[in-house]
Amino acid sequence: MIEFIRGYVDYVCPEYIVIDHNGIGYEIFTPNPFAFQESREAAVTVYTYEYVREGVHALYGFPTREERNLFAKLLQVSGIGPKGGLAILAAGRPDELARAIEEENEAFLCKFPGVGKKTARQMILDLKGKLGALAAPAAARSAAPLSGALAEAVAALKALGYAEREIEKIIPALREEAMSTEQYVKRALALLLG
């Protein structure tokens, strides 16, 4: 099992990144490949999950061990495969997902791509009580790193010329619900301009 890979981002595309580690390029599928775009000059650590099944051998990577562990737990849920797990993690923050499972919030879980009522119920049945510190209280969440679509939206806002301090002021309002990158950008612009 490969715990993590530390190296330089060589290539970024919509589905995966390539990490150059000592001259070997590792193709790693991530929930949000473009979050690694800004790290092209510096060494990055990607925590990996090695997925081996009939005819499939793939690496899935995450910025934190916690997110990687949540991905592994999602794969244990009937009806969720690697692509579904990545889509769920790309659409929201791990702590919000864990809290929704602990609180049995089916409506929130159904907002994630590919998750209907049946899958949401299965997630609650299989994972409730098994996510530990991920379902942290609100005070701990405020300092949590951005992930998924929100990180992409923040990168887009920076590209549009907004200052980091302006963006930080609206992040708590953006974290209130899971949205796509486009929806986050629209909401952020409304908050910044309004």
Curated annotation (Swiss-Prot):
Entry GO CC: cytoplasm; Holliday junction helicase complex; Holliday junction resolvase complex
Residue segments, region Domain III: 147-194
Region annotated Domain II, chain positions: 64-142
Family matches, as InterPro entries: DNA_helicase_Holl-junc_RuvA_I, Hlx-hairpin-Hlx_DNA-bd_motif, NA-bd_OB-fold, RuvA, RuvA_2-like, RuvA_C, RuvA_C_sf
Subcellular location field: Cytoplasm
One MF term in the entry's GO annotations: four-way junction helicase activity
SUPFAM superfamilies: DNA helicase RuvA subunit, C-terminal domain, Nucleic acid-binding proteins, RuvA domain 2-like
Gene3D superfamilies attached to this UniProt entry: 5' to 3' exonuclease, C-terminal subdomain, DNA helicase RuvA subunit, C-terminal domain, Nucleic acid-binding proteins
Coiled coil: none
One Pfam family recorded for the sequence: HHH_5
Positions of the UniProt region annotated as Flexible linker: 143-147
Annotated segments matching region Domain I: 1-63
Keywords assigned by UniProt, alphabetized: Cytoplasm, DNA damage, DNA recombination, DNA repair, DNA-binding
Domain of life where this protein originates: Bacteria
A GO biological process held by the record: DNA repair
Subunit composition and interactions: Homotetramer. Forms an RuvA(8)-RuvB(12)-Holliday junction (HJ) complex. HJ DNA is sandwiched between 2 RuvA tetramers; dsDNA enters through RuvA and exits via RuvB. An RuvB hexamer assembles on each DNA strand where it exits the tetramer. Each RuvB hexamer is contacted by two RuvA subunits (via domain III) on 2 adjacent RuvB subunits; this complex drives branch migration. In the full resolvosome a probable DNA-RuvA(4)-RuvB(12)-RuvC(2) complex forms which resolves the HJ.
Role: The RuvA-RuvB-RuvC complex processes Holliday junction (HJ) DNA during genetic recombination and DNA repair, while the RuvA-RuvB complex plays an important role in the rescue of blocked DNA replication forks via replication fork reversal (RFR). RuvA specifically binds to HJ cruciform DNA, conferring on it an open structure. The RuvB hexamer acts as an ATP-dependent pump, pulling dsDNA into and through the RuvAB complex. HJ branch migration allows RuvC to scan DNA until it finds its consensus sequence, where it cleaves and resolves the cruciform DNA.
Family: Belongs to the RuvA family.
Domain-level remarks: Has three domains with a flexible linker between the domains II and III and assumes an 'L' shape. Domain III is highly mobile and contacts RuvB.
UniProt-recorded name of the protein: Holliday junction branch migration complex subunit RuvA
UniProt organism field: Geobacillus kaustophilus (strain HTA426)
Primary gene name: ruvA
